UniProtKB/Swiss-Prot annotation:
S-adenosyl-L-methionine binds at residues 63, 65, 83, 99, 124. This is Ribosomal RNA large subunit methyltransferase E. Specifically methylates the uridine in position 2552 of 23S rRNA at the 2'-O position of the ribose in the fully assembled 50S ribosomal subunit. The lineage of its organism: Bacteria, Pseudomonadati, Pseudomonadota, Gammaproteobacteria, Enterobacterales. It comes from Blochmanniella pennsylvanica (strain BPEN). The gene is rlmE. It is found in: Cytoplasm.
Length: 208
């Protein structure tokens, strides 16, 4: 069941989408998505990226975050992106199409980046929503746990993690799990995130 109020197939959703100032700005600047502005706002506060870093981008399609990161880490940096959806090629970005919960896909991902060699793990993964809060939040936390597990395998000491999750039951426990791996944990809600959305972004720094 899809909540018709916010369904991407509804005329109401489409009207709001195309009137959105960030959608308009993304179109004007020829960006792939409005999520570029979310990452920019977070990075202005938390300074996640620097030249030469290796970054994993989970839930990368259509490529808004990958393009942003590329502009920050330069030609000496490296981005490995992964999504179940296709993504148009971005020069300098290695894209892996598949579900990162699939052991075969995660094995390829780990092979590409090496053990404890990644500076930042990003996850903008989101579940298909039902409009039923308890289900949507649970699915979001599940994706957050997948991303956190990838951090445990690939993130170097003092590395950083940025993950999108939905607010609701289970978030407090998830925050505790993130705290167990990182010294600094913050919650961000950038202006480009729609006010009615349950999404928040957890910024975790200084992997233990």
């Amino acid at each position: 069941m899809v909540n018709s109020k916010y369904s991407m197939c509804s005329s109401g959703w489409l009207q709001k989408h195309f009137k959105d100032q960030y959608v308009k700005a993304a179109q004007r600047q020829k960006l792939r998505s409005r999520s570029w502005f979310k990452l920019d706002a977070i990075n202005r506060i938390d300074a996640l990226f620097s030249t030469g870093m290796t970054v994993i981008d989970l839930g990368s399609a259509p490529g808004g975050w990958a393009l942003y990161v590329k502009s920050k880490i330069g030609k000496t940096g490296r981005i490995v992106a992964c999504d179940i959806l296709s993504m148009r090629n971005i020069s300098g970005v290695n894209f892996l199409k598949g579900d990162c919960s699939n052991p075969n896909i995660s094995k390829i991902l780990y092979k590409w980046v090496g053990q404890k060699q990644v500076n930042v793990v990003l996850s903008d993964m989101a579940p298909n929503t039902t409009g039923i809060s308890i289900i949507d939040v649970s699915r979001s936390i599940h994706l957050g746990n997948l991303a956190l597990n990838i951090c445990r395998n690939v993130l170097m000491h003092r590395g950083a993690f940025l993950v999108k999750v939905f607010q609701g039951k289970g978030l407090d426990k998830y925050l505790c799990d993130v705290h167990s791996l990182f010294n600094i944990v913050r919650i961000r809600k950038p202006d480009a995130s729609r006010s009615h959305s349950r999404e928040v972004y957890i910024v975790a720094k200084e992997r233990k």
